[in-house]
Structure formats: structure tokens, C-alpha cells
Amino acid sequence: MSATRAVTVDGISWPVTGAQVAVIEGNRVLVQLRPWLPGWELPGGHCEPDEEPQLTAARETFEETGYRIRIRGLVGVYTWSGLRSAGDVLYLGTIEGGRPRRSIEAWAVRMVDLEHLPRTLFPWYHQRLRDAFASASGAAPVHRVQTVTMHHVLSFGSSWMRTPVDALRQRRRR
């Protein structure tokens, strides 16, 4: 069960139930492959009762990826318009130890270049990653409303089909 916490950006407190972390090294970011609705995303999860969001982000990152991290700062709060009413908080993090591993929540873990993100990165992460890289360069925390509707969820699945279809098209052209 998720617990609601408040995170303040520009003097306004926003309710959040989830916390994530962007671990950035140079031009690369840590992502994980979720098994259900399969897709790539940042590590993180739901806040437990009596757990601060920073601790959630660190705990979930370790459980999902095998990396122990240190929170470096706040990127922003992302509230939803559409399917969800709860918000997420995103932090910057640094790897302090551990080794990458697969888990029931992360079938694969890897560092990817910002210019070569996986095609199947969940669409709402593109803005979050732009914000995270800006934050790593000193930008102030942000609040953004992200629209996620059933259309977004259903159309996202088509990106998984494009990969094998593109491969078949390439073979036919040869």
C-alpha cells in the first residue's frame, strides 16, 4: 500500500505516493526494463507508510537494480492528469556501491546514452530525463503535470511491435 507524502517545489507542497531516481553519469542514465507493461523506466516505486520519499527512491533502486545510491538532490514533482491522481517525485542519485542485477521488477538494468534511449522507454520519462539532466547542471526543481490516458498506455504497446516488424522489413529489402 502506498503512503502519500508532500514534497515542496517553489513553496507549494505536492502530494506524492511514488519516488524515483535518475542516476546520471556523464551523458548516460540508469534505466531498468519493467516486465509488466514491458518498458524501460527509471528505478523507483511506491512510498511505504512512514517512509520518506528519498528513502523510498534509495530502497527501491537497491531492490530493483542491486545498486546502493546516495540522493544528490531534487529534480521535481510530476503530478498526473488522466489515469492517475497521485504524483511522483524524482531525485538525482549517485551510485555508492553494489552490482547490477536483475530482479522480479527489473528484467534488465543498464546505463544508456541520453541520445540513444530505448524505443520502449515509457513516454512520460522523456520530459523527466530532460529535467534530470538540467538538474544535474544546476537547474532548479520543477513541477510538471503529465497527461497519461488509456490511449497513451495502449499506443505504447505498439512500440514493442515496431521492433520485430522493422527487422522483417529490413530482411525483405535485402
Describe these PLM feature segments:
Residues 1-20:
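Acidic, metal-coordinating catalytic segment for phosphate/diphosphate chemistry
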Residues 23, 92-94, 110-113:
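Short, well-ordered beta-strand micro-motif
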Residues 29, 98-101:
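Short helix-loop capping/hinge motifs at secondary-structure junctions, enriched
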Residues 38-39, 105-174:
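Nudix hydrolase/Nudix homology domain
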Residues 66-99:
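Active-site segment of metal-dependent pyrophosphate-handling enzymes
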